[in-house]
Amino acid sequence: MRRRLLRAAVLAPLAGTLATLPGCSLPVQVDGTFLQPWRSHLQWGLADWQRSLKVAHTLGCRQLVLQWTGIVGGSDGDWSLPDGSLQQLFTAASENDIRIRVGLPFQQRWWQAIGADDATLQAFLAESLAHARRWLAQTPWAQQPAFEGWYLPYELEQYHWADPARQQWLAQWLQGLVQAASARGGDCAMSCYFSRLQTDGNLVTLWQAVLAHAAVRPMVQDGVGVAGAGNVQQLQPLLDHFHAHSIGFDAIVELFRELPGGPADGSGFKGETADAARIQRQLAWARDSGAQHVLVYALEPWLTQDTPQAAALRRRWGLPQ
């Protein structure tokens, strides 16, 4: 799942209706949520962050993964959340007893680089590591009381990383990122998903190579939003490996479904909020997976937006309209 493309489906959230929530127990509780910021979040004030974090708190969230703090090399130019916005996020998080895992700036060239030749990939890894080191050296967020750790905003899958040499380059790159991040304080987490593209690679071998060099916390996407319910079966060998080696991981439940008719490469993604029954089955899988935490992707926008599908999910989850 290329989450960079999900912005195509993002609609304006209900700004006020979810701000005041009932005190009753809700039928769904999750450990955390992602938040994928876009340029529209540059306009958010403290009240917007408070609204978003209040919804998360009501559903039991104790962690929010800020997918990235900005984008480098995007088609509409570089941008980043200003310090004032991030401070407001941390303020709202502290008010709601939620800890923030801060995503590094996302290098948009990632998707092109991992599909390119070896020289292009190696150049990208070197340049992006240097950029991340510079950013980490000056960022203050690890000192915030609500700071949980760092998130590396690059998703691993077995298709582009089947070659052992590339696995080693990836592992060394991640080792550099982890070292730079840990110098500021805090661990690093990174997501993975099962690619439907035909390949000789597999996620177990990939994570073995990564964890031999870099102490990265795995976060496993269920992939149901794009690949369907059967995708979780493809993840079982990886989960078995984590269990056998006592490797802690988190599970990510996708709250959306991809609408048919989009390009096969994932560009121009169009999606909508999934139905509550499907999501309930996903949550049951995640809780039975052995994951230490179950996170959803994502309350914003798939629960909060002003669509009939999101409204139906709010009703099922006992939230006001």
What are these regions (language model features)?
Residues 4-25:
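N-terminal export signals
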Residues 24-61:
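Boundary/entry segment of secreted carbohydrate-active catalytic domains
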Residues 103-105, 151, 177-201, 220, ...:
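Aromatic-lined carbohydrate-recognition surfaces of secreted/lumenal glycan-active proteins
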Residues 225-227, 248-320:
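Substrate-binding cleft of secreted/luminal carbohydrate-active enzymes
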